[in-house]
């Protein structure tokens, strides 16, 4: 997707559809930085005064710039607090985002720039109080500013403190990005990629540094290279207030903010209860400070205006300056400029390493505007001196201090000439709208100039920031990749465990079904065997009964025949009596046989019942044996499955352990590679910085050497002038002496006296000339020696400074390397402990599961045996009640089918 195409509805809703160039008019540049430029503007529809921050998202790092714009817009939309800048909207125009906010007079840093001295303690407390209220609001919503400094703490006309510039802000806490401005960075931000995450406490550190900045006009380590300052902050003690004039309350507040350990650093809400913030102060302290600053800015701009008007007046009246006048004027302006730069020391020129978008497009050069506008006033002054003076006084007739031409519409202008067009521009200058500010015109001009001059340093810092950001992305990408790999590995192992559990469950179900089928089959076989056994006994008993009945019939016949024979032999017994005796005998025999048959049937029934009962008992015992065999088979199967599961878990643990060690090694290797690359880049940056400083010093020395002949010539001319003055004095003295001698000596001696005086004058002039030559030679030698010594001293001081910075870098890198190695060792130990603990838990789990399985085995077998024993006892008791004795020793009959 092309950046700015706004195809995503959610992104499109972030921007207004109006044309910003038509909506906002009278744009005047009021600030410049790495992101681009900030303009004063007026809403053409509502006449509301606003500030417009233009951010280009074209060129290099387009995607990053666009994402940063989206992040800042989303961040600003969330803010609703009196101590944060009010967001008005955002517009897009030709790959440039117009971020519109409420207009503020300037920043706390501008106060230092204008007054050229630290703020008073009550003023610092008032500014800090407002900033803390804004930070408390941000931190409550888990937001981090990450670029707190005096330049980002703005002031409004009523004296309201506003936090601004959220280009570095984070919408998540904790965070771990390397962002901010070097001198104000907290140690944990510098070490973010190496040691982990940070939270809103980084803003508290930056606020403490800002307090020192307001109290000493610049932050600690400001005279140091920005990169070296990072190394210094990361490994040295926290800075403190240097001067003893500050109160103990202020000192404690700063020390409280600058605790090295983030956990010991207070939160914003805690600092709001600090006595430094809560103590009484004048209610209008900030309003009075703003008014004094506006008055001072008015005077500065008036002074600059008068200087430019004087220069242009001289050029118009006298033409170009001659060489000597030009050199003198250049020297004066150069010394003034050097004094101004040395005294002010622009803090805004420090490039912020926050994610920001750079816009190289800006308005016309403000100095050119001042020159053009001054020339216009000059034309009017030539026409009417009184009008010119009046115009000069009305340039700053209100609190509106300085003026900028409309941004983006400046064209190269011709040399100032008293023409009609110049007069019209002068009229435009007089009638153009002014606006209130606490930032002088020269400060804005210097910011633009320094922004252009320090492009190399800014690019170096930006490149370093991009490298750290890229390294962080690489680490996050690798961590995500390793996490995905570990998740996939664990999912695979989990599936394997689930598959094993499912297979085990299926096997147990199959075994249970098999055992049920076996039991049912055995029951059917037992029922068939019992039926067959009963039928066999009944058949045998039927056969025995038949045999017994046949035997009785035979015996009955024999007895009958025997009785008949006995009766036939007995002839004495009457026939009737014989018949009766035979009948009675038959009846007795039949009765006996009937009793014997009944007894046999009873015995057979008892035998049948007893043997059937015994057979049932045998079937029951056999069923018990089958149940015991089944439960042992099931328990053995479970044990085998559990052992296989445990072996699989051990294998999984070992494979996970190998993967964890391999991933840790991969992550640590990448981290060390990135640190080596970072250290190499830092070293290259430092060497490049050293070379640049040496080149600048060499260039300065070359310029001094080139300038030395002019300086020597001027000094030689001064000595020559002294010599000429001395010669004139001696000539006058010679004339006076000659006249006196001629008056007091006879006329005939005049010739000799004149010759003597002439020789004496010649001798003295020769001595004077020799002294002159000697003075010139000594002066040249001393100046050359002095220049050589000064340059050598500067070279020595620079070498010492660069050596100290290099040693600081080496110490920082050694510390980072040692900390990283210690971190790696801790990670390895932590992993070893985790692996060891996990293995111990696994072994304990295996032991517990085996013990539980053994307990289950014992309990189930015990339960089964007890149940079977109760069942056997119940069966035997019932057998006893049925009249059967001990069935255990009962033998089957020989004809038993078994």
Swiss-Prot record:
GO cellular component: cytoplasm; lipid droplet; plasma membrane raft
Keywords tagged on the record: Acetylation, ATP-binding, Cell membrane, Coiled coil, Cytoplasm, DNA damage, DNA repair, Kinase, Lipid droplet, Membrane, Nucleotide-binding, Phosphoprotein, Serine/threonine-protein kinase, Transferase
Primary location: cytoplasm
Pfam families, per the entry: Pkinase (PF00069)
Reaction(s) catalysed by this chain's protein: L-seryl-[protein] + ATP = O-phospho-L-seryl-[protein] + ADP + H(+); L-threonyl-[protein] + ATP = O-phospho-L-threonyl-[protein] + ADP + H(+)
Disruption of the gene: reported phenotype: Lack of marginal zone B cells. Reduced naive CD4+ T cell abundance in spleen, lymph nodes and bone marrow. Reduced protein levels of PTPN6/SHP1 in CD4+ T cells with no difference in transcript abundance. Increased phosphorylation of LCK at 'Tyr-505'. Lack of ESAM+ CD4+ type 2 conventional dendritic cells in the spleen and impaired CD4+ T cell immune responses. Impaired osteoblast differentiation and aberrant skeletal mineralization with mice displaying enlarged fontanelles, delayed closure of the sagittal suture, occipital hypomineralization and low bone mass in long bones.
List of residues that carry Phosphothreonine: 357
PROSITE patterns (UniProt xref): PROTEIN_KINASE_ATP (PS00107), PROTEIN_KINASE_DOM (PS50011), PROTEIN_KINASE_ST (PS00108)
Keyword Cell membrane (UniProt): yes
Domain of life: Eukaryota
Stretches assigned to coiled coil: 452-502, 548-649, 754-871
Catalytic residue positions: 147
UniProt GO molecular function: ATP binding; protein serine kinase activity; protein serine/threonine kinase activity
Ranges of compositional bias, category Basic and acidic residues: 405-416
GO biological process: DNA damage response; DNA repair; MAPK cascade; mitotic G2 DNA damage checkpoint signaling; negative regulation of JNK cascade; positive regulation of JNK cascade; positive regulation of lipid storage; positive regulation of osteoblast differentiation
Outcome recorded upon mutating residue 53 to D: Reduces the number of eosinophils in the lungs
Entry membrane topology: Peripheral membrane protein
Induction: Up-regulated by a high-fat diet (at protein level).
Region: Disordered, residue numbers: 316-375, 405-424, 565-596
Residue positions, PTM Phosphoserine: 324, 343, 346, 349, 359, 442
Keyword Repressor assigned: no
Subunit structure: Self-associates. Interacts with ERN1 and TRAF2. Interaction with TRAF2 is facilitated under ER stress conditions, such as treatment with tunicamycin, and may promote TRAF2 phosphorylation. Interacts (via N-terminus) with STK25; the interaction promotes STK25 abundance at the level of protein expression and/or stability.
Similarity field: Belongs to the protein kinase superfamily. STE Ser/Thr protein kinase family. STE20 subfamily.
Entries under PANTHER family matching the protein: SERINE/THREONINE-PROTEIN KINASE TAO1-LIKE PROTEIN, SERINE_THREONINE-PROTEIN KINASE TAO3
The protein's role, per its UniProt record: Serine/threonine-protein kinase that acts as a regulator of the p38/MAPK14 stress-activated MAPK cascade and of the MAPK8/JNK cascade. In response to DNA damage, involved in the G2/M transition DNA damage checkpoint by activating the p38/MAPK14 stress-activated MAPK cascade, probably by mediating phosphorylation of upstream MAP2K3 and MAP2K6 kinases. Inhibits basal activity of the MAPK8/JNK cascade and diminishes its activation in response to epidermal growth factor (EGF).
The protein's name: Serine/threonine-protein kinase TAO3
Organism of derivation: Mus musculus (Mouse)
């Amino acid at each position: 997707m092309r950046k700015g195409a706004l195809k995503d509805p959610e992104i499109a809703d972030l921007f207004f559809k109006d044309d910003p160039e038509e909506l906002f008019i009278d744009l005047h540049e009021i600030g410049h930085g790495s992101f681009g430029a900030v303009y004063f503007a007026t809403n053409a529809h509502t006449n509301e005064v606003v500030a417009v921050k233009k951010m280009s998202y074209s060129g290099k790092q387009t995607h990053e710039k666009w994402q940063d714009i989206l992040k800042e817009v989303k961040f600003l939309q969330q803010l609703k607090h009196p101590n944060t800048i009010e967001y008005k909207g955002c517009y897009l125009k030709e790959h440039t985002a117009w971020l519109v906010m409420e207009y503020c007079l300037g920043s706390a840093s501008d106060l230092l720039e204008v007054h050229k001295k630290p703020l008073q303690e009550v003023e610092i407390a008032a500014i800090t109080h407002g900033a803390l209220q804004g930070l408390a609001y941000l931190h409550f919503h888990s937001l981090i500013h990450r670029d707190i400094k005096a330049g980002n703490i703005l002031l409004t006309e009523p004296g309201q403190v506003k936090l601004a510039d959220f280009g570095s802000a984070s919408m998540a806490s904790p965070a771990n990005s390397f962002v901010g401005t070097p001198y104000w960075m907290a140690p944990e931000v510098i070490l973010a990629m190496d040691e982990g995450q940070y939270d809103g406490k980084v803003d508290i550190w930056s606020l403490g540094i800002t307090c020192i900045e307001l109290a000493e006009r610049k932050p600690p380590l400001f005279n140091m290279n920005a990169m070296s300052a990072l190394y210094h902050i990361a490994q040295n003690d926290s800075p403190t207030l240097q001067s003893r004039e500050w109160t103990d309350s202020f000192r404690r507040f700063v020390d409280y903010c600058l605790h090295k350990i983030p956990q010991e650093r207070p939160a914003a809400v805690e600092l709001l209860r600090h006595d430094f913030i809560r103590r009484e102060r004048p209610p209008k302290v900030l309003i009075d400070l703003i008014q004094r600053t506006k008055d001072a800015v008015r005077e500065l701009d008036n002074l600059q205006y008068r200087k430019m008007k004087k220069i242009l007046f001289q050029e118009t009246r006298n033409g170009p300056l001659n060489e000597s006048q030009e050199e003198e004027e250049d020297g004066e302006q150069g010394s003034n400029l050097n004094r101004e730069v040395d005294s002010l020391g622009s803090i805004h020129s420090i490039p912020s390493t926050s994610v920001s978008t750079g816009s190289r497009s800006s308005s016309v050069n403000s100095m050119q505007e001042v020159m053009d506008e001054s020339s216009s006033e000059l034309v009017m002054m030539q026409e009417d001196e009184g009008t010119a003076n009046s115009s000069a006084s009305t340039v700053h007739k209100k609190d509106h201090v300085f003026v900028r031409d409309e941004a983006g519409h400046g064209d190269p202008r011709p040399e100032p000439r008293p023409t009609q067009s110049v007069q019209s521009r002068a009229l435009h200058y007089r009638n153009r709208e002014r606006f209130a500010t606490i930032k002088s015109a020269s400060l804005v001009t210097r910011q633009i100039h320094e922004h252009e001059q320090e492009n190399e340093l800014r690019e170096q810092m930006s490149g370093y920031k991009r490298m750290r950001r890229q390294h962080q992305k690489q680490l996050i990408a690798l961590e995500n990749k390793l996490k995905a790999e570990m998740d996939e590995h664990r999912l695979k192992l989990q599936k394997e465990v689930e598959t094993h559990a499912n297979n085990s469950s299926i096997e147990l179900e199959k075994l249970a079904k098999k055992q049920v089928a076996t039991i049912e089959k055995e029951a059917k076989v037992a029922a068939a065997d019992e039926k067959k056994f009963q039928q066999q006994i009944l058949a045998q008993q039927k056969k025995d009964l038949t045999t017994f009945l046949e035997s009785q019939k035979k015996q009955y016949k024999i007895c009958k025949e025997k009785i008949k024979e006995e009766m036939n032999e007995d002839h004495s017994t009457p026939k009737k009596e014989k018949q009766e005796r035979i009948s009675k005998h038959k009846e007795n025999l039949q009765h006996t046989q009937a009793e014997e048959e009944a007894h046999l049937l009873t015995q057979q029934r008892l035998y049948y019942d007893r043997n059937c009962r015994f057979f049932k008992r045998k079937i029951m015992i056999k069923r018990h044996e089958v149940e015991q065999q089944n439960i042992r088979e099931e328990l053995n199967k479970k044990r085998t499955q559990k052992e296989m599961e445990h072996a699989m878990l051990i294998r999984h643990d070992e494979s996970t352990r190998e993967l964890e060690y391999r991933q840790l090694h991969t992550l640590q290797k990448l981290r060390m590679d990135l640190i080596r690359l970072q250290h190499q880049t830092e070293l290259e940056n430092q060497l490049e910085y050293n070379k640049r400083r040496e080149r600048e010093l060499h260039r300065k020395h070359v310029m001094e050497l080139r300038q030395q002949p002019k300086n020597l010539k001027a000094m030689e001319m001064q000595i020559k002038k002294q010599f000429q003055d001395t010669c004139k004095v001696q000539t006058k003295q010679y004339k006076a002496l000659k006249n006196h001698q001629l008056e007091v000596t006879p006329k005939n001696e005049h010739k000799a006296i004149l010759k003597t005086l002439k020789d004496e004058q010649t001798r003295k002039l020769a001595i004077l000339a020799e002294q002159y030559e000697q003075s010139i030679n000594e002066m040249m030698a001393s100046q050359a020696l002095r220049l050589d010594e000064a340059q050598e001293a500067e070279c020595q001081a620079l070498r010492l400074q660069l050596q100290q910075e290099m040693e600081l870098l080496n110490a920082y890198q050694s510390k980072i390397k040692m900390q990283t190695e210690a971190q790696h060792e801790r990670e390895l130990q932590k992993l070893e402990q985790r692996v060891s603990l996990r293995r111990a838990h696994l072994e304990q789990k295996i032991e517990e599961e085996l013990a539980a399985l053994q307990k289950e085995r014992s309990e189930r077998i015990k339960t089964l045996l007890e149940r079977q024993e109760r069942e056997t006892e119940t069966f035997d008791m019932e057998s006893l009640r049925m009249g059967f004795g001990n069935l255990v020793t009962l033998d089957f009959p020989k004809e038993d089918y078994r």
